[in-house]
Amino acid sequence: MGNTVTCCVSPDASPKAGRDRRVAERGEPYQTQVELQETDPGPHLQHISDRDFPSDFNDECNPSDHPQASTIFLSKSQTDVREKRKSNHINHVSPGQLTKKYSSCSTIFLDDSTVSQPNLRSTIKCVTLAIYYHIKNRDSDRSLDIFDEKLHPLTREEVTDDYCKHDPDHKHIYRFVRTLFSAAQLTAECAIVTLVYLERLLTYAEIDICPSNWKRIVLGAILLASKVWDDQAVWNVDYCQILKDITVEDMNEMERHFLELLQFNINVPASVYAKYYFDLRSLADDNNLSFLLEPLSKERAQKLEAISRLCEDKYKDLSKAAMRRSISADNLVGIRRSNAIIS
């Protein structure tokens, strides 16, 4: 009892010899057991999010995966923005009549674009402007054959030899993307996800978007985003009907390479999506692509509230459906109650 330690020793055996023998018998198996526990982790199923990436791959530097990393298109556009401001300052260019509207205590100006339901036309303009800055301020001309339009033309027209030397302007990129979105009836959210996949491809594959490959890279990103984001059946043959001269086999091969280069990482977290949306708005503000602002009225407030509730109910239904499909014993989010039988 208390601090007293007692032990029992066989009367016909020496205490010291017996103690040494028992220590020797128990010590070695115990050490072996410890070594086995340290070296054998046992059966363990690794989750896809726990995959080991190369040592030089820093997730925090990839804006398409990490919400705190700055988007590539916004950083590439800052060079031109600074040059425009410097040129206006040197040449004493007056901004002229102020067309930007500011809210006051009596009037609030809002546009019809929200993070949950962006304006389609304005979003496509901003996304294509981001692609334009990617091409204009690229670091080099690294590319892959699968995206080379000279090797895989989208039309029957012959591609000129100097095709890779002329950067497309913003209007050219906008017309190409707008045609695809109008024909396929895609949403504005799909345009934002397209830009996320595009920057993820450039980061993962270590390539640049340039005049020789921009159409096929954008087409592959739109194709993948439309299948992942939009809740509708999209087939590669649908895009072949829009782009008359491309074959289904070419579309399938490009999609397969695109997925492999993305390492099949098609996940877009909500925080990353929101970051791209607000950075696109900043890009629009820096380049005078302002959204159409209107005074907030009672009718507009009710409309915005209805849109928010509709999107909220939609996401709740999607999350409930996902929970029903993927619920498991180790992922219980609440207490599950069974119906009581009263007799």
From Swiss-Prot:
UniProt-recorded Gene Ontology molecular function terms: protein kinase binding
CC per GO annotation: plasma membrane
GO biological process: regulation of canonical Wnt signaling pathway
CDD domains: CYCLIN_CCNY_like
UniProt xrefs under SMART domains: CYCLIN (SM00385)
Keywords: Cyclin
Keyword Ribonucleoprotein recorded: no
Family named by the database record: Belongs to the cyclin family. Cyclin Y subfamily.
Protein name: Cyclin-Y-like protein 1-B
Lineage of source species: Eukaryota, Metazoa, Chordata, Craniata, Vertebrata
